[in-house]
Amino acid sequence: RLPPGIAAVTAERGRGKSALAGMLLRQLGGEAIVTAPTRSAVEVLASFAGETLRFMAPDALLASKEKAAWLIVDEAAAIPAPLLRQLVSRFPRTLLTTTVQGYEGTGRGFLLKFCASLPHLQSFTLSAPIRWAAGCPLESAISQLLIFNDEAFRDAPMGEIALEAVNQSCWQTQPALPEAMYQLLSGAHYRTSPLDLRRMMDAPGQAFRCARAGGAVAGAL
């Protein structure tokens, strides 16, 4: 049992951090409140927690006088820092989870900025997958197919900006360009899903614009 304080768990997308939080919640019984940017964001957590889930939206929780031994915040980096700071101050023990990919991958900055300001924070990284066996080739294949990697956009492209129209046919003729656009959009938008990738590939009525700087994708619309 963790002593009073705040713990943060980071992991790559799909590694199982929400499942891990759900397992903890099942053990805690009714001793915890769960919050997240949206109710749908805790579906995986809820499937592992069983009937013990007590969810409240962040603003509703802050406005209430609810008390619990634990506060579990899933996708914590997607909650505004001032609101999150008020929430964690209300509970004796808080577990924060965030991914290091996609929009919620602001979790990298979340750890450096928000968590760095918290005294006695215990930080953990979930490296062993819960959904997969370690080194499972299926995980690597799915990550590649669904374009989960957004590491290319850690540094902003430099140079003169050039705008161009991009057609859906580029997925067949020049796939690297729409892939880079999707990676950028995924990293900049909250809860991008594989359905968004499918729509970008084949949904009718789509129009795309790309901004390039020094040959690299700097913007996408």
Features from the language model and the residues they span:
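Pre-Walker A (Motif I) flank of P-loop NTPase domains
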Residues: 2-7, 206-207
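Conserved RecA-like ASCE ATPase "motif II neighborhood" in helicase/translocase motors
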Residues: 51-89
